[in-house]
Design a protein with these regions (language model features):
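A late C-terminal transmembrane helix in Major Facilitator Superfamily
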Residues: 339-372
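Juxtamembrane intracellular "pre-TM" segments in multi-pass secondary transporters
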Residues: 2-11, 191-224
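Cytoplasmic helix-loop-helix junction between adjacent transmembrane helices
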Residues: 103, 109-148
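A membrane-interface helix-boundary motif in multi-pass transporters
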Residues: 164-176, 366-389
């Protein structure tokens, strides 16, 4: 009987996996879409466009805290019920964002969206793991995680085109309606599907690497610091790059959507290439250093040029090299850690990522100033972002020497 229950527990139909992928895709798109629309949204409510990074930070920091507080349950039925609750929350929060006309209220809506979005990412990933067998667990998890670069490559350009670059409310209304439709499908799988496929059973507990264990572990501290520095160096710039393109250079919506498309495709191709290659520790360190230098070059050249075409190319290249660097670092860290610490880093990665994105967005807004001609001065950001980009290989080499 136990074996039968186990077999039914791990059975994950392809249709349901598609729905779970769409949930992850739309939640990731909700988080990413704020970046190209942030300057338009702040202008819409009468706020300074230099504050646009706070909209990114509001979502990311609240999502990071939520990821730390929400733990995946071992009961499959409970996880599905929690997913339905968090889906309802993110749908309402995203929709109400389009109704506000005050910057503070907009920040509050993004905080609520981050809370529900962060919780949904954790619970959705855990639900997939619970519903997958050992032979499909890695594949299903990889499929779910690939939704983020796909959201960047396909989702963001489509939203920009849908909104015609200016009507950001239409983009977020489309997001909320899409989430609603996917929620109905997800509810229908349980309501009208074969209910014995989702039994009310509890998976066995494993010996987890706790937060107290992480505090005592030097390796865990280094892994967290390195991952945080890599993501912070990326998003301190990537949150303001499209703002600079829109406000200072007046980039067209079509060109901006092409930038996101090329960035997403390039990052996806780089990820696929790296996943198929084998490199020793020395080559990995050299790759991280070269990618960090490329980040500095693209930032300085992109923000200093007056040509919107050259700046667009620099933005696309920056996204590709920074995304590749983060992937290489996180992959090498996860693969080099012992099993218990590896599980902890995987579960903490979402929180680290959201926190770094939030701090990066807030930091970039703090060092960005408005000029009298209604453009923005990013000069302090160039120095800070260059130091952040180069700090990651320094931390890497320092740890390896230890």
């Amino acid at each position: 009987v136990k074996e039968k229950i186990k077999n039914k527990t791990i059975h994950l139909p392809q249709f349901e996996m598609t729905i779970l992928f769409l949930i992850h895709f739309l939640v990731g798109l909700d988080a990413l879409a704020i970046v190209p629309f942030s300057s338009i949204m702040t202008s819409y409510v009468g706020a300074d466009t230099a504050w646009s990074g706070y909209l990114v930070s509001a979502y990311s920091i609240s999502a990071a805290i939520t990821c730390l507080c929400v733990r995946g349950a071992s009961n499959i039925r409970r996880e599905k019920n929690r997913m339905l609750f968090f889906l309802a929350g993110i749908i309402l929060a995203t929709f109400f964002t389009t109704l506000v006309h005050d910057f503070t209220a907009m920040i509050l809506c993004r905080v609520l969206t981050g809370i529900f979005g962060g919780a949904l990412v954790v619970v959705n990933l855990n639900y997939v793991i619970l519903r997958s067998g050992d032979e499909n667990k890695k594949r299903n998890t990889a499929v779910l995680m690939s939704s983020l670069p796909l959201a960047l490559a396909v989702g963001v350009p489509l939203l920009i085109l849908l909104a015609s670059g200016e009507d950001w409310r239409l983009a977020f209304q489309f997001l909320s309606v899409s989430l609603l439709l996917v929620s109905i499908l997800f509810f229908g799988v349980d309501r009208f599907g074969d209910k014995h496929q989702i039994p009310n059973v509890t998976a066995p507990n494993s010996d987890l690497f706790s937060v107290s264990d992480a505090i005592k572990s030097r390796t865990a501290w280094f892994s967290i610091l390195l991952a945080f520095s890599a993501i912070l160096g990326t998003f301190a710039v990537s949150t303001q790059f499209p703002v600079m393109l829109s406000v200072n250079l007046g980039i067209s919506p079509n060109l901006l959507s092409i930038c996101y498309l090329m960035s997403g495709v390039g990052a996806f191709a780089a990820v696929q290439f790296y996943g198929r290659t084998k490199a020793n520790e020395r080559n990995v360190g050299l790759l991280i250093l070269l990618l960090s230098i490329a980040m500095v070059v693209t930032v300085i050249s992109g923000f200093q040029t007056k040509s919107v075409e050259l700046a667009s190319i620099a933005f696309s290249v920056f996204v590709v090299v920074s995304s590749t660097r983060t992937l290489v670092l996180v992959t090498e860290l996860i693969c080099s850690l012992p099993a218990r610490e590896r599980l902890f880093l995987i579960s903490a990665q979402n929180s680290i990522q959201h926190l770094a994105v939030g701090v990066g967005g807030m930091l970039s807004s703090l060092v960005t100033y408005s000029k009298v001609n209604s453009t923005l001065d990013f000069s302090p950001l160039l120095y800070i972002s260059s130091l952040l980009a180069l700090s990651t290989p320094i931390i890497w080499y320092w740890h390896k020497k230890q």
